[in-house]
Amino acid sequence: MIDKVFNKSITKQFEFDEEVASVFDDMLNRSVPFYKEMQRLSINFACNFLSENDKVYDLGCSTASTLIELSKHCKHNLKLIGIDNSDAMLKRASNKAKAFGVEIELINADLHDVTYNDAKLILSNYTLQFIRPLQREKLVKKIYDSLDEKGIFIFSEKVISTNSNLNKQCIDEYYEFKKTQGYSEFEISQKREALENVLIPYTEDENKKMIKDAGFSHCETIFKWVNFATFIAIK
């Protein structure tokens, strides 16, 4: 389905409800620049670290597209676990996994309440930015503690610049991108308002500091487009 969530006046803050879940895949592809390329790169990097029967968690798995793609492209059999707190998302994830013949354990839970046992890889695509900063850093420390030795954490985030002029230019460039994807000025402004105080981005350096503070030995930016970035962190 085509994303038309914000072509009407908003009455609430952004949330991953049934309306959003029904168009989420289209929303991602049209709202996140080079989303498919980011996903491809993340999977390629992940596959280089994975072995037979490794356990993989996707935090905020939404419709499970990344886990499904990982299963298709990785030569190993993996234990795939998707976690989300939206019933609507998990229902679609379950249907998609069945359609593609991919076995995924789907868990409806708050990310802070899950025990990530024996994880070799933890994924988080545009999820941390929706978690309040103090809780975000606690979760990243939990991720670090849960990973096997030499486990990896791959995550993507919207980022901001410390330079106000550059930050405005980045935002303007992003909105121009959204227009090329068929979103109107009204839809763009409505979504911006709905995300106010819901999505809280860090700078690229702040993300890397958070990772280092959690204990990771290395963090690298493997993809970036203006104010969207993908990182790989190695335990």
From Swiss-Prot:
Homodimer. Pfam families: Methyltransf_25 (PF13649). Keywords: S-adenosyl-L-methionine, Transferase. GO terms for biological process: tRNA wobble uridine modification. Belongs to the class I-like SAM-binding methyltransferase superfamily. Cx-SAM synthase family. HAMAP family: Cx_SAM_synthase (MF_01589). This is Carboxy-S-adenosyl-L-methionine synthase. One of its GO terms (molecular function) is carboxyl- or carbamoyltransferase activity. InterPro entries: CmoA, Methyltransf_25, SAM-dependent_MTases_sf. Its EC number is 2.1.3.-. S-adenosyl-L-methionine binds at Y35, G60, C61, S62, D84, N85, D110, L111, N125, R192. Catalyzes the conversion of S-adenosyl-L-methionine (SAM) to carboxy-S-adenosyl-L-methionine (Cx-SAM). It comes from Aliarcobacter butzleri (strain RM4018) (Arcobacter butzleri). It catalyses: prephenate + S-adenosyl-L-methionine = carboxy-S-adenosyl-L-methionine + 3-phenylpyruvate + H2O. Gene3D superfamilies: Vaccinia Virus protein VP39.
